[in-house]
């Protein structure tokens, strides 16, 4: 992601994204003076997730809704995270990714994820956004949410 002279973000889109395995750390510019560090922690690192949450300002949880086989596992991990003490008073963004994929799950199928249950656990600190990794649809909404977390 890069900040253009106009102040708008250019978000490069990679349609051949694979799941994270370890930890990927990126710096994300929010404006001309503020940059935040984003830590993408893969599912294989699940036992260490609570450690990363302790110092986090918020949680962004990305679900690949083109992968029906992983939805139940993603939901289980997400609900576990939402119940951790380290999540107390943290804002959470649930990102439904790859919504434009031909095999993307529809609303009736993603209802099994039970995001409403997480809203109760998080005391309404949950925001949900649907995005496309292919064309970048709604990526700016994600940036707006991140800026809101940091007061930018």
Segments from the language model and where they lie:
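TRAFAC-class small GTPase G-domain
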Residues: 1-152
């Amino acid at each position: 992601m890069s900040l253009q002279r106009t102040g708008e973000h250019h978000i490069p889109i990679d349609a051949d994204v694979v799941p994270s395995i370890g930890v990927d750390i990126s710096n994300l510019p929010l404006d001309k003076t503020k940059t935040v560090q984003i830590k993408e922690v893969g599912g294989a690192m699940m036992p260490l997730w609570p450690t990363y949450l302790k110092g986090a300002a918020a949680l962004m949880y990305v679900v690949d809704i083109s992968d029906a086989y992983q939805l139940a596992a993603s939901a289980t991990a997400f609900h576990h995270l939402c119940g951790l003490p380290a999540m107390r008073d943290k804002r959470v963004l649930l990102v439904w990714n790859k919504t434009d994929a031909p095999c993307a799950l529809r609303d009736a199928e993603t209802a099994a994820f039970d995001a409403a249950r997480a809203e109760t656990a998080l005391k309404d600190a949950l925001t949900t956004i649907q995005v496309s990794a292919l064309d970048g649809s709604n990526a700016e909404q994600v940036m707006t949410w991140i800026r809101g977390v940091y007061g930018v």
